[in-house]
Regions:
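"…together with the soluble PPM/PP2C metallo-phosphatase catalytic core" -> "…together
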Residues: 1-263, 267-301
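Predominantly late transmembrane helices and immediately cytosolic-facing juxtamembrane segments
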Residues: 300-308
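Short beta-alpha connecting loops at secondary-structure transitions
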Residues: 289, 308-311
Length: 311
């Protein structure tokens, strides 16, 4: 039994390494082509005026917001290369496993219990973010373009409702873990708690994009932390899925560190933020989001203070 367990662990480490490596190189390959598209169609960053960036021309705004001003016009929607890579790899290995046995069957990590929902919400949030980005580029919408904050929040809530339904009714989740205290069954309260976690994570993540390597670097650290947690829990398909995200993020950072060629945009930050929230709930460690995502919390807290103080 010990030998079988050791072989199983080694096999999963190999899966993680292979998927992360493939994700890294796929992102490296498609990024130059996508960058050309961004430049050709002038899909550049516009500074928002409906969030903390409203304070760019006033004293005392968040440091990140002040730095954003110099970045206006830098191509955005770079996050497409990340989530597209994850989708391609996940579906690609799943298709190969359906046509071939042996090695390819082992590499498949597309499972109902661990990766269906994270991938599904990633795609949903990515498309929502892409719409928001494009509206901002065209300056369609209120205060500089993009979706209204209220509309984005409603869509976050929708994603949270779908996720809560899946977790509660399909996967049987009804408890939360509080560090050092254990699991607590909360019954139907699990649904609003799930929705709150998704909305809070998505909102916080969405406020940090736009500085060279900042959002991608933070996401890489956070997904890495949750990969360790998932590995410890034996959720190997989820770990492999997270390794695909991390491999793509490393490649994204290759292009995104100073001077950044592009930013991930809302299509990147929204998709990764919502996915992170789902992963936290899937591993039943939502309260660990607080120490793991402290930078997101600080920046989003600064945003909220700015908005409420101006009102």
């Amino acid at each position: 039994m010990g030998l079988d367990s050791e072989i199983f662990s080694i096999l999963n480490v190999v899966r993680i390494f292979i998927v992360a490596t493939v994700a890294f190189f796929v992102t490296l390959l498609i990024t130059p082509a996508w960058t050309k598209v961004l430049h050709k169609y002038k899909l550049g960053k516009q500074i928002r005026t409906d969030t903390a960036f409203k304070s760019l021309h006033t004293e005392g705004g968040p440091i990140a917001a002040k730095l954003h001003q110099a970045k206006e016009g830098t191509p955005t929607m770079g996050g497409v290369v990340m989530w597209a890579t994850v989708v391609i790899i996940t579906i690609g290995f799943w298709l190969l496993a359906n046509f071939f046995d042996g090695f390819w069957s082992t590499m498949n990590f597309f499972s109902r219990a661990q990766t269906w929902l994270p991938l599904g919400v990633m795609i949903f949030a990515a498309l929502l973010g892409a719409l928001d980005d494009y509206m901002g580029i065209l300056r369609v919408g209120p205060k500089g373009g993009g979706l209204r904050m209220s509309h984005r929040m409603l869509l976050y809530i929708l994603a949270g409702v779908v996720g809560a339904w899946w977790f509660f009714f399909k996967l049987g989740f009804n408890s939360i873990n509080i560090p050092f205290m254990g699991d607590f069954i909360i019954g139907w309260w699990y649904i609003p708690f799930f929705i709150f976690t998704i909305v809070a994570t998505a909102f916080s993540a969405n406020e940090t994009d736009g500085l060279d390597g900042l959002a991608a670097g933070i996401f890489l650290t956070m997904f890495g932390a949750y990969a360790v947690i998932a590995f410890d829990q034996g959720r190997m398909d989820l770990v492999v899925f997270l390794s695909a995200i991390m491999g793509s993020l490393v490649a994204f950072l290759w292009f995104n560190i100073y001077p950044a060629r592009f930013f991930m945009g809302d299509t990147g930050s929204m998709s990764l933020g919502v996915t992170l929230g789902v992963v936290a709930m899937l591993t039943n460690t939502p309260f660990l989001l607080i120490p793991i995502g402290i930078i997101f919390i600080i920046e989003s807290g600064s945003v909220i203070v700015q908005l409420t103080s101006k009102k």
